């Protein structure tokens, strides 16, 4: 049983690292690099966004949900108020991710309004995702 706990916690941490790390990479490396390249910026964001959306949004968020539920029972022994809070924030992140990827991001190539929406939805999503990491640390420490 201890191996299962370690395995699912490990998977959860790796998936969270991929999700949050990907957003940090996009905002701290890709965005500043493309800022001075308006001729390729929008198309590059579209291409990078499509790839990250598939693995980051759809695959990793789904697997984070599954591993989070498994960890809730294997490690925490069930739901506690702090886990309810994390789950609530998680669902907000999923909603914002879908709004970003399926609405604003897709239209950002052709619309300045949607580009601005995509930018701010991405920033909000990053902030809330960092909050999820913080809540995860608190839960793991027993709060």
UniProtKB/Swiss-Prot annotation:
Which Pfam families has this protein been placed in? DUF4149 (PF13664)
For this UniProt record, give its keywords in alphabetical order, as a comma-separated list.
Cell membrane, Membrane, Transmembrane, Transmembrane helix
What protein does this entry describe? Uncharacterized protein aq_363
Gene Ontology CC entries for this record: plasma membrane
Write down the membrane topology: Multi-pass membrane protein
Annotated TM spans: 7-29, 52-74, 87-105, 120-142
Superkingdom classification of source: Bacteria
Query: Which InterPro entries does this UniProt record tie to the protein?
Result: TMEM205-like
Tell me where the signal peptide lies. none
Q: Where is it located? A: Cell membrane
């Amino acid at each position: 049983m201890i191996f299962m706990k370690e395995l699912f916690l490990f998977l959860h941490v790796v998936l969270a690292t991929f999700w949050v790390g990907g957003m940090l990479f996009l905002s701290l490396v890709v965005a500043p690099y493309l800022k001075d390249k308006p001729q390729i910026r929008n198309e590059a964001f579209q291409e990078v966004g499509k790839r990250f959306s598939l693995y980051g949004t759809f695959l990793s968020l789904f697997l984070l949900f599954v591993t989070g539920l498994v960890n809730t029972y294997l490690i925490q022994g069930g739901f506690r108020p702090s886990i309810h809070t994390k789950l609530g924030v998680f669902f907000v992140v999923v909603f914002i991710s879908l709004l970003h990827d399926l609405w604003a991001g897709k239209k950002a190539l052709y619309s300045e309004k949607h580009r601005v929406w995509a930018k701010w939805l991405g920033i909000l999503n990053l902030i809330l995702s960092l909050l999820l990491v913080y809540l995860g640390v608190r839960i793991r420490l027993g709060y």
